[in-house]
Swiss-Prot record:
It comes from Rattus norvegicus. This is Ig kappa chain V region S211. Residues 99-108 are annotated as: Framework-4. Residues 51-57 are annotated as: Complementarity-determining-2. The keyword Cell wall biogenesis/degradation does not apply.
Amino acid sequence: DVQMTQSPSYLAASPGESVSISCKASNKSISNNLAWYZZKPGKANKLLISSGSTLQSGTPSRFSGSGSDTDFTLTIRSLEFQDFAVYYCZZYNEPYYTFGAGTMLELKR
């Protein structure tokens, strides 16, 4: 099985800052079969990026995805208040569909 190691598990940042989240696949290349999701309380997970770097309709351009094979990164530039949420990577290199453990992005106090 492919294991997805996501880091960090927790991030604190302020509006206007930029943050990056890493996701690494163990054992084998997953090509670019990697998606990023945003989770907010009481809402369905929102697909932000597929194929490693393809922004979905409605995903703001301040979000970007990069990487291939085993190493991937989600970057959010110029954070806005609505960006504070939990983010997950998911690899979908059949027959596997494996999520990372998530990254909680919180407002820095």
